[in-house]
Regions:
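Accessory recognition modules or surfaces
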Residues: 79, 84, 97-99, 117-124
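Sec-dependent N-terminal signal peptides
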Residues: 5-14
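Extended, solvent-exposed segments with strong compositional bias
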Residues: 60-96
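Short beta-strand segments and strand-loop junctions that repeat across beta-rich extracellular domains
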Residues: 97-105, 129-131
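Internal, hydrophobic beta-strand segments that form the core of beta-sheet-rich folds
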Residues: 101-115
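Short, flexible, glycine/charge-rich loop motifs used to bind or transfer phosphoryl groups or to couple energy/partner
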Residues: 46, 96-97
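N-terminal non-catalytic regions of secreted/periplasmic and cell-surface proteins
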Residues: 17-64, 119-139
Length: 139
């Protein structure tokens, strides 16, 4: 019984420690189809820009509710401007080449900073190419 208590205590401690090392930051998407689609990152609000992004991926939700990467970049440091869809920033490497974005589909832009931080923004485009952020994509 004592061994079980010790094992559970150790597992809980490890879970708390792992949770303490991860955090989220803010991602913002803007633009429209046919024009630049930009992604910006902020530390804890929309006033302190985050520049230490290490990976960024745009994925689309498939018909079976899975996610498929549409574009992915890796590396980098000292991001000085927003990431533009399909344009690999200096110091980054393209892992998956960009594919065409289509109205009516659901997309997610996901970023990590290499220090345990991550962020995601879910978006789509209406028929005229305007970026939308509906409450639910399941309607």
């Amino acid at each position: 019984m004592l061994m079980r208590l010790v094992a559970v205590t150790l597992l809980l401690s490890a879970g708390i420690a792992a949770g303490a090392m991860s955090y989220s930051f803010v991602s913002k998407a803007s633009g429209r189809l046919g024009g630049p689609i930009r992604f910006e990152f902020f530390r804890d609000s929309t006033t302190r820009r985050k520049t230490d992004i290490k990976s960024f991926t745009v994925s689309t939700r498939t018909a079976d509710d899975r996610w498929k990467a549409m574009w992915s970049i890796l590396g980098g440091s000292g991001l000085t401007q927003p990431i533009q869809y399909g344009v690999t920033p200096p110091g980054f490497t393209t892992m998956i080449r960009p594919q065409k974005l289509i109205p009516g589909r659901v997309y997610a832009g996901s970023a990590t900073d290499g220090h345990g931080g991550s962020s995601s923004v879910t978006f789509g485009f209406d028929k005229d190419g305007t970026m939308i952020f509906p409450d639910s994509f399941d309607q």
